[in-house]
A protein has these predicted regions:
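Conserved glycine-rich cofactor-binding loop
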Residues: 7, 14-15
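Rossmann-fold cofactor-recognition segment
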Residues: 46-60
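Conserved NAD(P)H cofactor-binding loop of Rossmann-fold oxidoreductase domains
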Residues: 78-86, 229-230
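Catalytic loop of short-chain dehydrogenase/reductase
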Residues: 88-109, 123-161, 172-173, 193
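Conserved Rossmann-fold SDR core element
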Residues: 150, 159-175, 220-227
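C-terminal substrate-recognition "lid" of short-chain dehydrogenase/reductases
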Residues: 203-227, 232
C-alpha cells in the first residue's frame, strides 16, 4: 500500500507507540485521525493530524465515530485499555484477571465496527506484546490477553480477505507508561533488558516502523511481527 493520501485512524494515537505511528503516517502523506480518551493530549499531535475522543470499550460511541469518519484505508489500535493484573495465578484476584481482558474487548470492538468503513485494499494493525509467547512468572493475565489478540488476528484474517490484518508485538519499550525518571528509569530498563540480544529498551518509533511495514506490505496478513530486540530468543 502506498500510504500517501490514504485515510488512517489510530486508536491510542496520543501517546507512546500510537503517537509515533501517527507521526510516521503524517510524514508519509496520510490523512490521520488520532483517537484518545484525553483531549488535553491533542496538543502533542503533529501538524495535520486530527484528534477525536472515544473509549474503545464503548460500542455505541465507536459506531458513531466510524460513521462520522467515513471510509478509511488504515486502522491501527495501540490503545492499551483495561488493567494489568500481576502476580502468581494461584493468588490472583479473578476480577482483576478478567478486567485485564478489556484490552481484547477494545481491540475486537475496533475491528468489528472499523471493518464496515475499511476499503477492500485496507489494512488493520493491532499491538500485542512479547508476553503472549514469552510469559514470565506473574504475567499470566498479560500473556493470556496477548495470546488471545494474536489468535484473534489469525482467525479474522481468513474471514476479511482481501482486507488485511496483522499484529505487531513489541518487547520492552521506553514509553510514558513507566513513571520512573532519570537514573532510576535507566537502571530499570538496563536490568530488564540485560539478557536481550539487543540489550536496551526499544523506542516507540521503532515499533511504529513495524506497524508501517505491516501497512505497506500487501503480501503480509494474519501474522505477528516481533519488534523486541531479540527478547524471544534470549
Amino acid at each position: 500500500m502506498d500510504i500517501k493520501d490514504k485515510k488512517a485512524i489510530v486508536f491510542g494515537g496520543t501517546s507512546g507507540i500510537g503517537l509515533s505511528t501517527v507521526e510516521q503516517l503524517i510524514d508519509l502523506g496520510a490523512e490521520v485521525i488520532a483517537i484518545g480518551r484525553s483531549p488535553e493530549k491533542a496538543s502533542l499531535l503533529p501538524t495535520g493530524a486530527t484528534f477525536k475522543e472515544c473509549d474503545v470499550t464503548d460500542k455505541e460511541a465507536l459506531q458513531s465515530l466510524f460513521s462520522e469518519c467515513g471510509a478509511i484505508d488504515i486502522l491501527v489500535s495501540a490503545a492499551t485499555g483495561g488493567g494489568r493484573a500481576i502476580g502468581p495465578f494461584a493468588e490472583m484476584d479473578m476480577d482483576g484477571y478478567q478486567a485485564s481482558f478489556a484490552k481484547l474487548w477494545g481491540y475486537t470492538n475496533v475491528v468489528r465496527y472499523g471493518l464496515e468503513q475499511l476499503s477492500d485494499s485496507g489494512a488493520i494493525v493491532l499491538v500485542s506484546g512479547t508476553p503472549a509467547r514469552y510469559c514470565n512468572p506473574g504475567q499470566i493475565a498479560i500473556s493470556s490477553v496477548g495470546g488471545a489478540v494474536e489468535a484473534f488476528v489469525r482467525g479474522v484474517a481468513k474471514e476479511i480477505k482481501p482486507k488485511r490484518i496483522n499484529t505487531v508485538s513489541p518487547g520492552l519499550i521506553d514509553t510514558p507508561m513507566v513513571a520512573l525518571e532519570g537514573d532510576a528509569r535507566d537502571a530499570h530498563y538496563e536490568r530488564l533488558t540485560a539478557k536481550n540480544l539487543i540489550p536496551r529498551a526499544g523506542h516507540p518509533d521503532e515499533v511504529a516502523q513495524g506497524i508501517i511495514f505491516a501497512i505497506q506490505n500487501d503480501f503480509v496478513t494474519g501474522t505477528t511481527i516481533d519488534v523486541d530486540g531479540g527478547l524471544l530468543l534470549s
